[in-house]
């Protein structure tokens, strides 16, 4: 997952078949009523439909593209050692909701977040691999552990951080990667003539989400529960 990636409609139309082959290789069934299967439907035949897509259909297409691309790209970089963890993640994606505004107890989007985050790290030449609790980074001083948490409810931030603390403490040192996307303030598409406006709006959005809990984060950091926090947030823009 690199910056400024351009994906053609031709590539998107091939995504469902590629993902089906990956699931078959790992002996995983894709149910016809799953959100993952709906991602396939959004991408199939898109070359012939692209000029007649409504805005809601375009949004569904982009969300489907993101899920399928995360699976395909992560599959292309995993090692033999990571196959078991990868199999678990794609099983979660198939079994759970992928709707951004439909939080669940164990959301499939958190598995997508993990697949995206490890690609983000490897793109930046970090020696990262899928492993407990979610991602393991190889460093000169030993393994460094990352706990990935999608915040489905703002009421559960403390619980998620406490769980991450336990997971990291069992293994040594690490940090928490938080995904705040379920609480994005922009429904639909952010429209602007200046790309920088999107970045500034997202920065304000992330800061407003972080600020009310800053004291709690600081207390946990001061207690040595983990070494830091990263926050992911993004939106569709035109």
Predicted segments, located by residue:
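Conserved catalytic cores of phosphodiester-cleaving nucleases, focusing on short active-site segments
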Residues: 135-137, 141-154
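Short, solvent-exposed loop/turn segments at secondary-structure junctions
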Residues: 128, 151, 183
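Charged, structured surface patches that assemble and position nucleic-acid processing machinery
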Residues: 1-106, 110-115, 119-123, 158-238
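A short acidic/basic microdomain associated with nuclease active sites
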Residues: 118-141
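Short His-Asn-centered micro-motif
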Residues: 131-132, 148, 178-180
């Amino acid at each position: 997952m690199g910056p400024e990636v351009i994906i053609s409609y031709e590539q998107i139309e091939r995504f469902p078949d590629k993902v089906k082959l990956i699931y078959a290789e790992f002996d995983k069934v894709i149910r016809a009523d799953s959100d993952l299967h709906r991602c396939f439907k959004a991408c199939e035949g898109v070359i012939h439909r692209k000029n007649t897509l409504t805005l809601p259909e375009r949004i569904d297409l982009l969300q489907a593209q993101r899920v399928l691309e995360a699976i395909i790209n992560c599959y292309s970089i995993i090692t033999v050692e990571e196959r078991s963890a990868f199999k678990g993640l794609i099983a979660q994606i198939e079994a759970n909701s992928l709707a951004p505004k439909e939080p669940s107890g164990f959301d499939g989007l958190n598995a997508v977040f993990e697949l995206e985050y490890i690609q983000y790290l490897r793109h930046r030449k970090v020696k990262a691999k899928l492993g407990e609790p979610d991602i393991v980074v190889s460093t000169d001083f030993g393994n460094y552990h990352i706990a990935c948490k999608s915040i489905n409810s703002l009421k559960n931030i403390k619980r998620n951080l406490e769980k991450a603390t336990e997971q990291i403490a069992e293994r040594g040192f690490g940090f928490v990667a938080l995904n705040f996307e379920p609480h994005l303030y922009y429904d639909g598409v952010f429209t602007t003539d200046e790309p920088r406006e999107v970045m500034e709006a997202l920065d304000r959005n992330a800061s407003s989400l972080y600020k009310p809990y800053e004291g709690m984060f600081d207390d946990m950091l001061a207690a040595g529960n983990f070494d830091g926090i990263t926050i992911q947030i993004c939106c569709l823009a035109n």
